[in-house]
Regions:
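Helix-loop-helix hairpin linking two adjacent transmembrane segments in secondary transporters
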Residues: 103, 139-185
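Conserved MFS/SLC helix-loop-helix module at the cytosolic interface between two early adjacent transmembrane helices
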Residues: 63-101
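Paired small-residue
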Residues: 87, 91-94, 102-110, 307-313
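Juxtamembrane intracellular "pre-TM" segments in multi-pass secondary transporters
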Residues: 2-8, 188-218
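A late C-terminal transmembrane helix in Major Facilitator Superfamily
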Residues: 328, 332-368, 378
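Membrane-interface helix termini in secondary transporters
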Residues: 38, 66-70, 74, 158, ...
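Cytoplasmic helix-loop-helix junction between adjacent transmembrane helices
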Residues: 107-144
Length: 402
C-alpha cells in the first residue's frame, strides 16, 4: 500500500483526517447534551422525551453499522464515507428547522448516518496495519479524536447559554462541511474491494457470530462503553435537576471524562504492543469498575455532590480509553479479511447496547430521584465488562491465541 500523502486522494489518508472524521462522529453524539433540559422547555415536552434524542440516535447508529461495514467492503471506504457526510449535512439542516419535538427527533435520528465515521476510521486503520500495530494506531487516533468531544460539551454549554441550543447544530453543520472537503481531498481508497453482493457479505455474519472470541471482545467493549452511554443518558439530568448546575457548568464537568479517555488512549497507544491486547482490555475494565464502585460507596456514605459524581467519572474515561482501542483491534483481528464487516457488526452490538442503557438511564431518573440508580447501572455495566474479557483470556489460552 502506498505511503500516505496529505491532501492526495490517490493515497491512504493521514492520521489527522481519520481523527477529524471520527471526531465529528463523537462530537455529534455529545455536544448538545448540556442543552437537553432547555430543549425540553423549547419544545414543551418532558426531559424524558428529549433524552430520547440520545437513545434513538444510538439505536439507529447501531442499525446503520450493520450495513456500513459490508457496503464499504464492497464499494470502498471513500465512497461510503463521502455519501454519509452529505446525508449528515442534510439531516443537520433538518434539526435546525424542525418545528416540533417529533420532527426534531426524526432528523436527529437521521444524523446517525455519521456513524460511518466511527466504523470506517477503524476499518481504514485495519486496512493499513495489522493486529497489535492496529491497536496502537487506533489508540493514537482515538486519543486525538477524544480531544474533540472533550471540549464539545464545554462549547455546547457556552453556546447554549449565549445563543440557545440551535447554535450547537449550526456548529455541526459548519464542521460537517469542512470534514466533507477534507475527506474528498485526502482519503484515498484503502480497502481491497470484494466483488460480492451485499447479501453475500451479510451471510458472512454467522462466521463472526460463531466466534467466541469475537463475542468476548465485542461484549467487553459493549459493557465498558455501556457505562459511558448510561452516563450520557443520565448525567445532564443529574447536573441540572439534582445539583442545579448551569449548561456551561455541566458541559465543563463532562470534560473530566474525556480527559481520562485521552489519557487512557495515550496509555493504549504507548503500551498495547508491549503488554498485549487482552491484558490491556482487562486493565481498562478493572479501572472503570473500581472507579464506579468507589463512586457508589461514597454516595452511600452521604458524600455525594457534583465534585464526587463528575470527578470520579475520570476513571470511567481512563478505563474506556485503555479498553476500547484494544477491544476494537481484537474483534477486527478475529477475521481480518472481514475487517469492515466486523467493525460494523461489532459497532452495532456496542452502540445498540449503549442505546438501551441510555434509554434505561432516562427511565430511572425522574422527579424525586437521586443519582444512585444511575451510578448502580454504570457499576453493573462495567463489572460485566470484566467478566467478558476474562472469558476471552480463558478462550485464548485454550486455543493458543495471543
Amino acid at each position: 500500500m502506498q505511503n500516505p500523502r496529505f491532501l492526495d486522494r490517490t493515497t491512504p489518508p493521514k492520521i489527522v483526517t481519520l481523527i477529524l472524521v471520527a471526531g465529528l462522529s463523537a462530537l455529534t453524539m455529545n455536544i448538545f447534551l448540556p442543552s437537553l433540559p432547555g430543549m425540553a422547555l423549547y419544545y414543551d415536552v418532558s426531559y424524558g422525551v428529549m433524552q430520547q434524542s440520545v437513545a434513538l440516535y444510538l439505536a439507529l447508529s447501531a442499525a446503520l453499522q450493520i450495513i456500513i461495514g459490508p457496503i464499504s467492503d464492497r464499494y470502498g471506504r471513500r465512497k461510503v464515507l463521502l455519501g454519509s457526510l452529505v446525508l449528515f449535512l442534510l439531516a443537520t439542516i433538518g434539526t435546525l428547522l424542525a418545528p416540533t419535538a417529533t420532527s426534531f427527533l426524526i432528523f436527529r435520528m437521521a444524523q446517525a448516518v455519521i456513524a460511518a465515521g466511527m466504523v470506517l476510521s477503524r476499518a481504514v486503520v485495519r486496512d493499513m496495519v495489522a493486529d497489535a500495530q492496529a491497536a496502537s494506531m487506533i489508540g493514537y487516533v482515538t486519543m486525538g479524536m477524544s480531544l474533540v468531544p472533550m471540549i464539545g460539551p464545554v462549547i455546547g454549554g457556552v453556546l447554549d447559554d449565549l445563543y440557545g441550543w440551535k447554535a450547537n447544530f449550526a456548529l455541526l453543520l459548519v464542521l460537517g462541511l469542512g470534514t466533507l472537503a477534507l475527506v474528498w481531498a485526502d482519503l484515498g481508497e484503502t480497502a481491497s474491494l470484494r466483488r460480492v453482493s451485499l447479501a453475500e457479505q451479510i451471510r458472512t455474519y454467522p462466521a463472526l457470530l460463531a466466534s467466541r472470541r469475537f463475542w468476548g471482545y465485542t461484549l467487553a467493549a459493549a459493557f465498558a462503553s455501556g457505562c459511558f452511554f448510561a452516563y450520557l443518558g443520565g448525567a445532564p439530568y443529574v447536573g441540572d435537576k439534582i445539583y442545579g448546575l448551569s449548561s456551561t457548568h455541566v458541559g465543563a464537568l463532562f470534560a473530566l471524562t474525556a480527559i481520562g479517555y485521552a489519557a487512557g488512549n495515550f496509555f493504549a497507544g504507548r503500551y498495547s504492543i508491549r503488554i498485549g491486547m487482552n491484558r490491556m482490555i482487562l486493565i481498562g475494565c478493572i479501572v472503570t469498575t473500581v472507579g464506579m464502585a468507589l463512586l457508589a460507596l461514597l454516595t452511600l456514605l452521604g458524600l455525594s455532590g457534583p465534585t464526587t459524581f463528575f470527578g470520579l467519572t475520570i476513571f470511567m474515561g481512563l478505563g474506556n480509553g485503555i479498553c476500547l482501542p484494544n477491544a476494537n483491534a481484537g474483534l477486527l483481528s478475529v477475521r481480518p479479511e472481514l475487517a469492515g464487516t466486523a467493525s460494523g457488526l461489532g459497532g452495532a452490538i456496542l452502540i445498540g447496547g449503549g442505546a438501551a442503557l441510555a434509554a434505561f438511564a432516562g427511565v430511572l431518573l425522574g422527579p424525586g430521584s437521586t443519582e444512585m440508580p444511575l451510578i448502580l447501572l454504570m457499576l453493573a455495566s462495567s463489572a460485566a465488562s470484566v467478566v467478558a474479557i476474562l472469558f476471552v483470556i480463558r478462550r485464548a489460552r485454550q486455543i493458543g491465541a495471543a
